[in-house]
Amino acid sequence: MEPSILAVRLKRLLENMIRTSSQDSGRQGVLARYLEERLRERLPPHLWPHLEQEVSVPGLAREKKWDLGLVYPAGSSLPKKPRLLISLKSILKNPSGSWPNRLDDLVGEVSSVQLLFPEVVVGYVVVLDYGAPTKRRGGVYRPPQGNELDPIYARFKQGLAALAQRRPPLWAQGLVEGC
């Protein structure tokens, strides 16, 4: 598919996602389907059946449902192993209070699964709403003024960059592959 068509489609999808209530647990489903389609275009056909949404994978602490996962082999005599796992996150409300929690989520989710499956590749897709309402004193939410969220999102991106450096020789748990 033409890159410009993909960009327009992704933009519309994200705009709709941002307009959806931050309390709607299914709001990221459209993004998961989009990513699944993009991955299928790049995977060999014999792996397509193993790419699923909402895939349950054991972790050291507990089982987690990953938004998108490539888990194979799927034969009855062979144990399933996650090869690629993708977690979708969004910050659509109160970014100043949410971004540290998203980084903590990342480290916890990734460490738990990497301790059991150290070779797994983990992706972390985050949607940031630069117009997200921010909690003010007294618990009142209001839209940001100008570029006031820029420093908050810059710190979040720095935190993600610090965690996105999993490559030889740095294979530590809690890190993800960078792009």
Spans of model-derived segments:
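A short acidic, glycine/proline-enriched capping/turn motif at secondary-structure boundaries
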Residues: 75-76, 91-93
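Acidic-basic catalytic patches of nuclease active cores, encompassing PD-(D/E)XK
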Residues: 2-55
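Alpha-helix termini
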Residues: 43-44, 73-78, 113-117
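Phosphate/oxyanion-binding active-site loops and adjacent basic polyanion-contact surfaces
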Residues: 24-32, 61-64, 98, 102
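Acidic, metal/cofactor-coordinating or nucleic-acid-engaging core segments within structured domains
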Residues: 94-179
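Short coil-to-beta-strand
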Residues: 5-6, 77-85
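Conserved catalytic cores of phosphodiester-cleaving nucleases, focusing on short active-site segments
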Residues: 68-70, 82-92, 106
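Active-site metal-binding core of divalent-cation-utilizing nuclease and nuclease-like domains
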Residues: 48-79
